[in-house]
Amino acid sequence: LGFVFIRFQAGPQPNIRHILRKFEEEVKQYELDKLLPSGDPFWQETVAANWKCVRDVDNEGYHVPLAHPGLHDLFGSNYYDEPLENGTNRSLGGFREGTNSLWSVKNYRSILSAKQTLDEAHKNAWLYIGVFPNMVLGLYPDSVIFYQEFPVENGKTIQRGASYRYAEEDRQMRLSRYLSMRIDRLTSKEDEQLIQWSWESAFSSAYDGVILSE
């Protein structure tokens, strides 16, 4: 798929290429082997919560309409998650029809310069592919991202990620990428609050011991 994965220790899991094989036809139109660094450094932050709280919030797309105004303005009711199967899951957010209301979303839609190798559906959608247990690839019409979490200790998690640009990026696509990253940054700040609430709820009298991120 264009990324290099290194196995540091032998284990029973199949290799990543095998795990992601079912997405090969859909993903090859993004030409991931031709991606270039965006110029932004890898980002990393420490989250004061158990890593499963972080993953639980990211896995559950049903909160998008209430918690993520930007994504809801972009997708409307067109966002859905597919269940985890054989170590991977897929989510797709198709851009909604009609006029957008938020500044970043409205301008993103109006100037979006999508990668020309994409079909019409993927020129108008954000695609996410998750790899169990802790990594997500985000495939956008204007760029590609990844992010992942690493548990440090109970109540402390490191989250890191990076963004990439398409080789043919011009000024308009670069501006599109800036706006999609702006939408993502706002979404990440909103997720921080959800993660905090999820972590704090585990210490409340109402917590019944449900297993997170099952």
Question: Would you name each region that the model predicts?
Answer:
Residues 2-214:
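C-terminal catalytic domain of Rieske-type non-heme iron oxygenases
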